[in-house]
Amino acid sequence: MKKLAIIIPAYKPRFLQETLDSIAKQNSHEFTVYIGDDASPYPLKTIVDHYKNKFDIIYHRFEQNMGKKDLPGHWERCILLSEEELICLFSDDDLMPFD
């Protein structure tokens, strides 16, 4: 098992591809990315599927939207998807600096 989980709570696709592109460009891929879809009406899974062969990525769609009323609750349920020792909580519009 990898030690680092990159947790990305997601709702809008606007910047998600750029976020995942920045992660894919890293020299080391010793991490697993978890995408927690907050019951988005947008096709986030289509974006995520593009990265399946680039690094370890796990997509989970939640049926209930929590972001509007309990954003920290949505973050927590996304974190609970992972089992890694370390976590890094990203937003779906964050960029990872190149290593």
Describe these PLM feature segments:
Residues 12-25:
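Short, well-formed alpha-helical segments that are part of the catalytic scaffolds
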Residues 3-7, 32:
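Cell-envelope/extracellular polymer assembly enzymes that use nucleotide-activated donors
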Residues 84-95:
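Short beta-strand-to-loop acidic/aromatic patch adjacent to the donor-nucleotide binding site
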Residues 24-61:
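Acidic donor-binding segment of Leloir-type glycosyltransferases
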Residues 8-10, 37:
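Short beta-strand/turn micro-motifs composed of small residues
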Residues 63-82:
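Glycine-rich, basic loop-to-helix element that forms the pyrophosphate-binding segment
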Residues 42-43, 94-99:
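Acidic donor-binding/catalytic loop of UDP-sugar-dependent glycosyltransferases
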